[in-house]
Amino acid sequence: MAKKSMIQRELKREKLVAKYAQKRAELKAIILDINSTEEQIWEAQIKLQKLPVNSSASRVQRRCKVTGRPHAVYRKFGLCRNKLREYAMAGDVPGLKKASW
């Protein structure tokens, strides 16, 4: 199981991403807009750089909902491979069955 502090850190990052998502999208739109002047683009880039680093969506890492494990997490289930196998063998994951051919 992951340390509780690491799980809380990821939750804090998710909150920051949600808080700054709209502002970040607006600044990126200005930067990518063809009709923007160089000064507008320059100002938008500076404002974007001044936003918190953890407000970027790429900083958030998927974690297992049960254990908090950061690696080998299946997006569809939100579980790491170990817990997914454990739950699948117990029949707790609807629609999932062991492959046999």
Swiss-Prot record:
Question: InterPro entries per the record?
Answer: Ribosomal_uS14, Ribosomal_uS14_bac/plastid, Ribosomal_uS14_CS
- What GO MF annotations does this protein's record show? rRNA binding; structural constituent of ribosome
Q: Which family does it belong to?
A: Belongs to the universal ribosomal protein uS14 family.
> What's the encoding gene here?
rpsN
Gene Ontology terms: biological process: translation
> What is this protein's function?
Binds 16S rRNA, required for the assembly of 30S particles and may also be responsible for determining the conformation of the 16S rRNA at the A site.
State any GO CC term: cytoplasm
Q: What is this protein called?
A: Small ribosomal subunit protein uS14
Keywords of the record, alphabetical order, are:
Ribonucleoprotein, Ribosomal protein, RNA-binding, rRNA-binding
PANTHER family reported in the protein's UniProt record: 30S RIBOSOMAL PROTEIN S14, SMALL RIBOSOMAL SUBUNIT PROTEIN US14M
Task: Cite the record's note on assembly.
Answer: Part of the 30S ribosomal subunit. Contacts proteins S3 and S10.
Specify the species: Francisella tularensis subsp. novicida (strain U112)
